[in-house]
From Swiss-Prot:
Pole-localizer protein involved in the regulation of several cellular processes. It is found in: Cytoplasm. Keywords: Coiled coil, Cytoplasm. Its main location: cytoplasm. GO terms for cellular component: cytosol. This is Pole-localizer protein TmaR. Residues 14-41 form a coiled coil. The gene is tmaR. It comes from Escherichia fergusonii (strain ATCC 35469 / DSM 13698 / CCUG 18766 / IAM 14443 / JCM 21226 / LMG 7866 / NBRC 102419 / NCTC 12128 / CDC 0568-73).
Amino acid sequence: METNKPSFQDVLEFVRLFRRKNKLQREIQDVEKKIRDNQKRVLLLDNLSDYIKPGMSVEAIQGIIASMKGDYEDRVDDYIIKNAELSKERREISKKLKAIGELKNGEAKAE
């Protein structure tokens, strides 16, 4: 009867890891969308900067645009780093799930 407890705990751990892996996949997709959105904003600000002419109180407007562009570029960099971290964790969980599956298959064949 006690042999069922570790097996049940193994199943719970497997489910927990599988759910975490799926959550990471959703987060990765969300971060990729944010990267694309912010890259589009950077491009928009580049284009907007091209249209502003000196007669339009350029210094103040270009200063604001430069600041906004820098903020968006920083966000893109932050999202790229976050995405890499999430991908790494997802790969580690995939390896653990595969190892658990192989271990269970090995035990089933031995019986």
